[in-house]
Amino acid sequence: ESRELERLSRDAGTAVTARMYDAGRLSEVSPSLFARCRDRYADALDLAWRDLRYTGDGAHLDDIIAGLVDSLGGLGAGPRDVVEMHRQVLAARAEGLTQRQARALREEGRFLVLRVMGLLVDHYRRTALARVDAPTPPREAP
């Protein structure tokens, strides 16, 4: 699974499209901002995993994820950025865990990465709809 995540986050198949739109991986374009988002994602995963084990209420987790998605959306992050962030955090958090704990962490991570991706899509959809719904200023007569 780890190798597949790495392949997905580094797949060169979309490099041409990314260059066309002047988009690069967030970790390369702005390493410090990527690191901040990655740290927030790590906090979210830690909290989600803790809540799984101790049945917390998840309210604080929602706040962390919402802030993370707003940041990622504002930075123009894409799916590969989210997968790269997820892969790095999962690798760091899995060190020193038993196989059973690592499996539970990966499972919780799958839910989290899908949730973040879905919310990021919603963020972009809302942004696009806001542009479409925005009133256009009247044109001046020639």
List the model feature ranges, each with a label.
Residues 1-142:
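Non-catalytic regulatory/interaction regions at protein termini and inter-domain linkers
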